[in-house]
Curated annotation (Swiss-Prot):
Belongs to the YajQ family. Signal peptide: none annotated. This is Nucleotide-binding protein Gmet_3206. GO terms for molecular function: nucleotide binding. It comes from Geobacter metallireducens (strain ATCC 53774 / DSM 7210 / GS-15). Keywords: Nucleotide-binding. The lineage of its organism: Bacteria, Pseudomonadati, Thermodesulfobacteriota, Desulfuromonadia, Geobacterales.
Length: 161
């Protein structure tokens, strides 16, 4: 029975490269001269520490542009609230989304069911497996999901006949 998996994964090496490029650009930019701004990557989170809101927004813009250049979707990033830190600094934590949460998995399965195709979706940990008897139905399900904006980046892997 043909099947495929729907996953939402981010290459952490690319995230590391994008953060390093952003740090390098921040160090070279004129508007950050004398600033104590810093960007650090910790496991699945990016910590941004900036002097003020203006610089924080500038750092986030730099990070987003670097992510896009490295082929990482902005949908894979979950932005935390900007909060004040010690010394008048501003801190923000950006979480890198790995996997499909249960709620998003339910949304994906609901979209698949709404298509009225003869396919079934099953939530398995952080991925969704879609099975069906007809390969064309599976491809139609992929097309439908690509057309929907579910708020996360989806990859379709492990297509088996």
């Amino acid at each position: 029975m043909p099947s495929f998996d729907i996953v939402s994964k981010v290459d952490m090496q690319e995230v590391d490269n994008a953060v390093n490029q952003a740090v390098k650009e921040i160090g070279q930019r004129y508007d950050f001269k004398g600033s104590k701004s810093e960007v650090t990557l910790e496991k699945d989170a990016i910590k941004i520490l900036a002097d003020d809101d203006f610089r924080l927004k500038a750092i986030v813009d730099i990070l987003q542009s670097k992510f896009i250049k490295r082929g990482i979707s902005p949908k894979a990033l979950q932005y935390g609230k900007a909060e004040t830190a010690s010394g008048g600094m501003v801190r923000q934590i950006i979480t890198v989304q790995q996997g499909i949460s249960k709620e998003k998995g339910k949304e994906v399965v609901a979209v698949i069911k709404d298509t009225k195709l003869k396919v079934q979706g099953q939530i398995q940990d952080d991925q969704v497996r879609v099975t069906g008897k007809n390969r064309d139905d599976l491809q139609e399900a992929i097309r439908t999901l690509k057309g929907k904006d579910l708020g996360i980046e989806l990859q379709f892997v492990n297509f088996r006949d």
